[in-house]
């Protein structure tokens, strides 16, 4: 089934966001593991795996719509030197992704592609949950301090 050209391009933009997020999250996850923050390492690693699943769905949909998945595109990866900066960088990336998903949902609706819209809506809900979790972590750091927050991240 031949998909709308604008929608296919938007799906490839989303794919670049997801592929970038995978790399950024994996680096942050491994940095946390290296610092002994095992709980945070596992949470961020799980997030990277979820982003891989998002990328897989996008690739499948692009192929179904007779497009070419552009896996050679990555956005700028922002690696934080410490946990608070990592959380801030990840939150910024999630806000960008959330907006892009909502733009893509509107476009899918405009071109009458309900199955793509439905897929995107499900992923947008998961991205919204990512934003919530990151904001919660930042709130905890503000409320209890970075030292206590990090001491709570050493256990799985």
Model-derived regions, located:
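Iron-associated oxidoreductase/ferritin-like identity signal
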Residues: 1-156
């Amino acid at each position: 089934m031949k998909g709308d050209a604008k929608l296919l391009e938007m799906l490839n933009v989303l794919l670049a966001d997801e592929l970038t997020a995978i790399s950024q999250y994996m680096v942050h996850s491994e940095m946390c593991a290296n610092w002994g923050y095992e709980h945070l390492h596992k949470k961020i690693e799980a997030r990277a795996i979820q982003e891989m699943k998002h990328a897989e769905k996008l690739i499948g949909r692009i192929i179904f719509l007779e497009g070419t998945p552009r896996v050679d595109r990555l956005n700028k990866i922002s690696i934080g030197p410490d946990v608070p900066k990592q959380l801030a960088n990840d939150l910024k990336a999630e806000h960008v992704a959330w907006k892009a998903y909502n733009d893509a949902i509107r476009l899918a609706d405009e071109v009458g592609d309900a199955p793509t819209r439905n897929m995107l809506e499900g992923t947008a809900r998961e991205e919204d949950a990512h934003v919530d979790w990151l904001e919660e972590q930042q709130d905890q750091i503000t409320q209890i301090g970075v030292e206590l927050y990090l001491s709570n991240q050493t256990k799985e």
